[in-house]
Amino acid sequence: MNPDRIFEEFPAPSYRGNQKQALRDIRDAFAAGNDVVLVRAPTGSGKSLLARSVAGCARPAGEADPSDATGAYYTTPQVSQLDDVAADDLLADLNVIRGKSNYTCILPDERNTPVNQAPCVRERGYDCSVKHRCPYFSDRAIASNRSIAAMTLAYFMQTAGSEVFRKRDVVVVDEAHGLAEWAEMYATIQLGPRTVPFWDDLRVPAIDGDLERAVRYCENLAEKCTRRKDDLLAQETLSPAEVRERDRLQELIGELDWFVSDYRDPGSPTTWLVDQSEPSGGSSVGDGDGDGGVDGDGGGGGGDEDGGPLTIKPMSPEKYLQHTVWDRGNKFALLSATILNKAAFCRQVGLDPDNVALVDVGHTFPVENRPLYDVTQGKMTYEHRSETTPKIARTIVRIMQEHPDEKGLIHAHSYDIQERLADLLRDFGVGDRIRTHDRDDRDADLEAWKATDDPDVFISVKMEEALDLKGDLCRFQVLCKAPFLNTSDSRVAHRLEEGQWAWYYRTALRTVIQACGRVVRAPDDYGATYLADSSLVDLFERARTDMPDWFAAQVDRMDRPDLPEFEPRAAVGDSSGVSRGRGTGARSSPGSPSRRDDDSTTASSNSNSGSGSGSGSGSASRSHSRSRSGSGSRSGTGSKSSPLADVWDTER
């Protein structure tokens, strides 16, 4: 790597904001001998351009010995970020490669067939006459032979050990703040009816937290998967369904072998946890947010030893990251707005802090253009939610009145909260401005909301990251709940039992900072963020030492706004001559609702004090979009001094 090339590799015709200083600091950090440079760059600083400059410093093939690594990888965990890179003319020399399922076959009778189910993977010995024109293999060949290959983090990790995508000189990871969590997610093994093709034929033992028993079961399951895969490989032709089964079996065998070998390795730093659901014939299990085991069959057999679907989770994925990331390059640049604590981040991902430098990029957006407003109405923990949610709904109406001609985003945190808020807002009579989404259509519903010129308000779930809502796409947002991790998750509970509360609050703060960056995307842009859950204010106090200076400045300026009195008709343009057309009544410049509000009306919950039955439109589309039911009712201790008071049952 030659860091002195960093300025000539900058792809834009000119610098803006702090980009030139950032490049200077990154160059100096690599020149000082650091193997890894963390770049903490806030929203709007042009991280992708900085990333391209670093990638361009990689050793070129013409200056390398045959054994030397050359070129660079650019990778990001977010598909939308990779889409943005692919569409950016300034980043045209980042050669994007995606997974096979993103490409379709070009054979005449297979135009709608994904490449991963095309004849070349269905038929043994198939010789494709147009492989040289296949969109997947064409993109792969280009990406593997050009100086910068761009891909998602999932694809990057899956190609570890590949002869096509070998070790390179430089690896750039964009949006790297969640690297440890992504690694834990990718390394997690789900064994249930959605992930094991012949699950119904299995007898699953009750593990009862016995890791050794889980390992023995996984060894046996890997053998069964291998036999089934070999049977499929022996066939001359496979159906698309059999192709999917074969590929899944191959993936599953790799996962199981990795778990068994890592567990048997006495030098491995990884701690493994095993969760098990009830079999389908046992006690009822609520519909979950993500695991694939709620409708599983415990398998044949009988007696009291039958168990249900298994989730096997790594606690410390350092070894996994070593193989999938750190062995893939010589030098690394990790970019994000929210790498909040260098030492903690390095510890999580298995890096030596002595070989890591942190470069801070200053924020260039005026703090007055990105205000935070305290409209807290109480706690949104499970035990307080039925009381607090109607108050937040009333407050949202008043915020809509404050922004009659501007689009807004509501961060609901869970589908249960989303549904309750949507029902209450419809009951209040402002449903004409409300949009929601479900799990299946979230991207389509988001794009439809972004495309409309109406001042609609979108109630979202888990959209705190990877959204670019510049300008009039969104002028205000409301955070309805502190985004604490779910304490019923065994991985979270294990860390909290070890006293890792700083990690817990830092993770929530990271999500809040990411959310705040959705609505202000340029120095002359502006947007307001309203905080409705009182636990958010407490979070700021607990995690203050991990705040970047530019976000601490926002928190220090936070006050309570003077919102209009509760009048739902005014929120939809039916009162006081307010029009729903864009331009009249809209706030056209940064600033705030003027100072304090005694909150006498928001404190009232005299109407619709429940979650609302909500017979309005949209209820059918939300019928399957409930949040995770959890595994019991671990409510807070009630003591305000206890960290548990604000966090139990956060996903419900």
For each feature predicted by the language model, list its residue ranges.
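Helicase C-terminal subdomain and adjacent C-terminal extension
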Residues: 484-514, 522-587, 594-597, 636-652
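Conserved lysine of the Walker
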Residues: 47
